Amino acid sequence: MSDSSTAGAMPAAGGVARPVFMQILPLALAVFVGFFMVGLPMPVLPLYVDGALAQGALMVGIVAGMQFAAALLSRAYAGSLADRRGARLAVVAGFLLGSAAGLFYLLADALASREPQAALAALMAGRAIMGCGESLIVTGALSWGVGRVGPQNAGRVMAWVGVAIYAAFGLGAPAGMRLYGAAGFGGIAWATVLIPMIALALVLPQRGVRAAGGTRTPFYRVLGLVMLPGLGLALTSVGFGVITAFISLLFAERGWDGAAWMFTLFGGGFILARVFFAGLPDKLGGARVALVCVLIEAVGQWLIWTSATPIWAFAGALLSGAGYSLAFPAFGVEAVRRVPAASRGAAMGAYVAFLDVALGIASPVAGWLAGLQGYGAVYAMGGACALGAMVVALALRGRVAAAA
């Protein structure tokens, strides 16, 4: 059934920040709880695949990329569901799929000692299901938030939903390492099954927003409309992808402790930038903000690549998180303003699909590169992609100036 209730009246321009935040807050809290389950296995999966299942760096990249590939393939459906049936339904379905993914993690853990290949297959199936769930949660939450507060606040919606996601990553990663040490991968699996139930308790009491009226633009046309900002998102997301997939192995390769803190520092930089500068893409324009942010991320990736001690790697994670933080809403503002309201969910799905493309392709490619050059080389790749995103931001800025 469709979501049936519209948001309250928009506040006056002079008092927009607090009412907008309060309307987004319940969604952000639910997304935080849901993505805590995604963050738990982040530092654990590379160790589990490389160690308990005795696979190599390439398979680590494939397992990491499986979730993102599945998310990519489900984006069109997620956007269509949010537009046709309501964003609330999409979010609820996403959390249920996340819990189902945990059941496959449990199966993988049960098979690991005697049938490692079957365990790997179950793990990959769980990652694929999690990818579909993540797609529905993110697309639905973004569409729901923009429906509540209006497209003029799209940057704030993306900013605060993003804060929830990366705060969950930042806290979930060290918690996952502790849980893995205490209860093994089975503990991670049970947590993945149960945590979405908490998120559902937060989401179900919330009122939805009506699907916007009007003619819906076909998804392939929406994809074309958001192509350029989506390319910027794809390039700037590679740095995030190589941190999530390979940082534990980089620290092991260099004989360092504290890999889980890289996720915390990345998340900390991400959150601080969002807290203090969330409104900049709406105020200054997405292209201008993106131009600065991707340069900061490139510096962070360079520090991780060249670091001789963990301190410099920690600094690189902080800068990478801060730079990536506003790049997502900055490019996203440019995407939203290109599509009609009736296709907003499809636009969110199409835009975030570029993140999936980046992570689904970059993780296996980075795994191949790591096998040739070592794990440090993947951060040179992340920095080069961030510099490529600068070129996209310059192109977007030129188009905005030409249209003015």
Please name every model-derived segment.
Residues 32, 116-136, 312-326:
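Hydrophobic core of transmembrane alpha-helices in multi-pass small-molecule transporters
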Residues 74-86, 273-285, 370:
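Helix-to-loop junctions at the C-terminal end of transmembrane segments
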Residues 96-116, 296-308:
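C-terminal ends and interior cores of transmembrane alpha-helices
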Residues 126-164:
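Cytoplasmic helix-loop-helix junction between adjacent transmembrane helices
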Residues 193-212, 392-397:
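C-terminal membrane-cytosol helix-exit motif in multi-pass small-molecule transporters
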